[in-house]
A protein has these predicted regions:
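Glycine-biased, small-residue-rich flexible motifs in mid-sequence functional cores and linkers
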Residues: 1-169
């Protein structure tokens, strides 16, 4: 799930990071992940897509064209599973571990408390990675953001100044 505002923030963030020569790593999920990758490509950047199954099984299927474009634009797709491995639910959580492990930090646009993004955050905390989130008022789609903010566990970015301060964390 991702709001229209979250989609725009994700796209703009991906584009900005690409223009600053920062690679974007995510799991090709629908919503914020997809928009961040599209923005990164539009900005001339490189994307790394982490798959929860074998490289022959792009999930969600609707992102097949995006996955192809990532590879054609000098990005890559990574899986820890052999070709032909069908996806199982636990593999999504393992994918979240890889997303964090391959990243310098984790940026949360919108995350519900019970979401894959929160798995990625937990792995990032255990790996001593930088974690930041955007602050916005869409409580129903950003309850995970709020929880982390209230616990004082992350840097909170304001929309307008957030992108510049992100690279200074």
């Amino acid at each position: 799930k991702c709001s229209l505002k979250g989609r725009k923030i994700s796209y703009d963030t991906g584009k900005y990071l690409a223009e600053k020569n920062v690679n974007v790593v995510n799991g090709l999920a629908l919503g914020c992940d997809t928009e961040a990758l599209k923005g990164t490509i539009a900005g001339g950047g490189r994307c790394i897509g982490i798959l929860p199954a074998g490289l022959d099984d792009i999930l969600p299927k609707s992102n097949q064209k995006l996955a192809d474009e990532i590879v054609m634009k000098d990005g890559c797709l990574i899986s820890e599973y052999p070709v032909g491995t069908p996806v199982k639910k636990y593999q999504y959580v393992r994918r979240d571990r890889l997303q964090s492990g391959l990243s310098d930090g984790v940026l949360i646009v919108e995350a519900e408390e019970q979401s894959g993004t929160m798995h990625t955050v937990e792995f990032a905390q255990n790996q001593y990675k930088r974690i930041a989130c955007y602050y916005h008022k869409l409580v129903e789609l950003s309850s995970g953001n709020r929880k982390l903010e209230e616990a004082g566990q992350i840097s909170v970015l304001k929309i307008k100044k957030g992108l510049k301060s992100l690279l200074k964390l």
